[in-house]
Amino acid sequence: MNKTITALAIMMASFAANASVLPETPVPFKSGTGAIDNDTVYIGLGSAGTAWYKLDTQAKDKKWTALAAFPGGPRDQATSAFIDGNLYVFGGIGKNSEGLTQVFNDVHKYNPKTNSWVKLMSHAPMGMAGHVTFVHNGKAYVTGGVNQNIFNGYFEDLNEAGKDSTAIDKINAHYFDKKAEDYFFNKFLLSFDPSTQQWSYAGESPWYGTAGAAVVNKGDKTWLINGEAKPGLRTDAVFELDFTGNNLKWNKLAPVSSPDGVAGGFAGISNDSLIFAGGAGFKGSRENYQNGKNYAHEGLKKSYSTDIHLWHNGKWDKSGELSQGRAYGVSLPWNNSLLIIGGETAGGKAVTDSVLITVKDNKVTVQN
């Protein structure tokens, strides 16, 4: 069926009713990570636990195949990237040997030829959770994410509180009732060279770090879209990293999903059109924060966006809608489109389906 998007009265989005984009994931899948290499999609972790799966998108009989389990334990919010035929997995949130929830700063490598994992003797100089990862000129770049010490301390306090609800309420109030700058989200840009397994300083944002941003890159440019400015408070900011020439430049583009912004959204490119879709946030939190309420999302219900935005002539236009709001899935480039795998919908429910967003002549097509 075709559906005209009347908001802004500019563009049209059509919802394809034919066969599913990809087979359903083997388990409901959210808060995991994924990558694509030579038309083969790899997904894992998050609600899949330590499981990883692959799917050959060019196969006549498309199906998910289980891979060797991840050796680092179940993790949420890890990131991954393919470099020179190997899959690298960065950080994430999980439990340590003592059973405490913590942020990791380690790196694991998966070899598709041998279906085997190895933990590298390499540690990022800071924790990696809520961060983004992208590849440029054979290196992985990481930026954003929560502060490892603050985040780990929060969960240590919760562990000590046990089932004491009064203590838990006090810990939560103490944790959330701070200004954004007091969470020290990572604004550094780090590079990881797989040939040496060394981390290097590559620059830093002139503004602030975010957690749960959407990321997409093409050529010498990378875009970081929305994300958290602090726990429970999103931003509508859009940052552009330009690697053209010898000097990295940071640019701030027009905002999107204003005024509250979202985290866990999806970003991609189709026919040179920059796409941003979905995400989750708390409506009214930005106003609360501006009015001096640091615990900005207290009492607010998380909402899930259906909006699809396109970057056009220096601004964002709402150009389509998802069939339902979703966030915290995996977004990948495929068939000159944005492929979304899994995610969560209202109430935090993990899903198993995929969505393909294609843009042609400023017309958005959504295939479910």
Swiss-Prot record:
Outcome of substituting E344A: No effect on catalytic activity
Documented effect of changing Y328A: No effect on catalytic activity
Subcellular location: Periplasm
Domain of life: Bacteria
GO terms assigned for molecular function: protein homodimerization activity; racemase and epimerase activity, acting on carbohydrates and derivatives
Positions of the catalytic residues: E228
Name this protein carries in UniProt: N-acetylneuraminate epimerase
Organism: Escherichia coli (strain K12)
Record gene name: nanM
